[in-house]
């Protein structure tokens, strides 16, 4: 088991470019009303840095750890989605949603299906259903279906990320903590986007959306550092 302190000490320096790029985004705070390739680059820069963070562990690491590879590819689709959302008012919002839907499926695949965590899954089904029920009266046209599918996909990703948190004590590894927290923050970010776009203006929505989004992506990238092993292995080791 790798402790959070050990991860911070070993991986913190590799994340310095990410933190700097994130600061650049918030300091420049380019107006969203004037989309440009410069604003797209500034928005995507922290995600590019997370690419480099994973690549810094070597191509061999990615090739021998399928979950890390899927998270890396998910970050690639995230950057494409970020670029599309810069021009969301010009008709590219659905394109961005599609890219992030692919991202969530890749992340869910990286998190795996063990342990199954049926209770966590049931909870996510209930929460996802409540979110969609709240959004539904404000959805029109294709968004009625597109948003429903997206909610189901991100809910599934959240389930797979948090399923490993069902045990306590030594079974809680950094991988599950980072993945679960990252997924939760991603859901908060996307829910804020949905509320602000379809329901009502959310105060300081952009700051809330981007801060939770960048934190989520960082934590999910960090979850790839320690190779994921089934939590059932912990039960077996305890039984011995």
UniProtKB/Swiss-Prot annotation:
Signal peptide: none
UniProt-annotated location(s): Endoplasmic reticulum membrane
Catalytic reaction(s) noted: a 1-O-(1Z-alkenyl)-sn-glycero-3-phosphocholine + H2O = a 2,3-saturated aldehyde + sn-glycerol 3-phosphocholine; a 1-O-(1Z-alkenyl)-sn-glycero-3-phosphoethanolamine + H2O = a 2,3-saturated aldehyde + sn-glycero-3-phosphoethanolamine
Membrane topology, record value: Multi-pass membrane protein
Extracellular face residues: 43, 92, 137-138, 196-206
Molecular function via GO: alkenylglycerophosphocholine hydrolase activity; hydrolase activity
Keyword terms of this UniProt record: Endoplasmic reticulum, Hydrolase, Lipid metabolism, Membrane, Transmembrane, Transmembrane helix
Residues in compartment: Cytoplasmic: 1-21, 65-70, 114-115, 160-174, 228-240
Gene Ontology terms describing biological process: lipid metabolic process
Stretches that traverse the bilayer: 22-42, 44-64, 71-91, 93-113, 116-136, 139-159, 175-195, 207-227
CC terms in the record's Gene Ontology section: endoplasmic reticulum membrane; membrane
EC number of this enzyme: 3.3.2.2
Function of the molecule: Catalyzes the hydrolysis of the vinyl ether bond of choline or ethanolamine lysoplasmalogens, forming fatty aldehyde and glycerophosphocholine or glycerophosphoethanolamine, respectively and is specific for the sn-2-deacylated (lyso) form of plasmalogen. Plays an important role in lysoplasmalogen metabolism in the adipocyte tissue and macrophages.
UniProt similarity note: Belongs to the TMEM86 family.
Name of the featured protein: Lysoplasmalogenase TMEM86A
Source organism: Bos taurus
Gene assigned in the entry: TMEM86A
């Amino acid at each position: 088991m790798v402790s959070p302190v050990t991860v911070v000490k070993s991986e913190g320096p590799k994340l310095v470019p990410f933190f700097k790029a994130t600061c650049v985004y918030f300091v420049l705070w380019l107006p969203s009303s004037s989309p440009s390739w410069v604003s797209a680059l500034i928005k995507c820069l922290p995600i590019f840095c997370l690419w480099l963070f994973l690549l810094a562990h070597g191509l061999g690491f990615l090739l021998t750890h399928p979950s890390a590879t899927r998270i890396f590819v998910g970050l690639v689709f995230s950057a494409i989605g970020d670029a599309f959302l810069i021009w969301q008012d010009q008709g590219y919002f659905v394109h961005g949603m599609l890219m992030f839907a692919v991202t969530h499926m890749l992340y869910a695949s990286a998190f795996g299906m063990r342990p199954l965590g049926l209770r966590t899954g049931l909870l996510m089904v209930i929460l996802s259903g409540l979110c969609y029920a709240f959004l539904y009266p404000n959805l029109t046209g294709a968004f009625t279906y597109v948003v429903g599918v997206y909610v189901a996909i991100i809910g599934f990703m959240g389930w797979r990320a948090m399923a490993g948190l069902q045990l306590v004590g030594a079974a809680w590894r950094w991988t599950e903590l980072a993945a679960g927290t990252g997924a939760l923050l991603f859901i908060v970010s996307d829910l804020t986007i949905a509320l602000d776009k379809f329901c009502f203006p959310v105060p300081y929505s952009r700051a809330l959306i981007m801060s939770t989004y960048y934190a989520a992506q960082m934590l999910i990238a960090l979850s790839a550092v320690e190779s994921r092993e089934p939590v059932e292995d912990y039960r077996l080791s305890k039984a011995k």
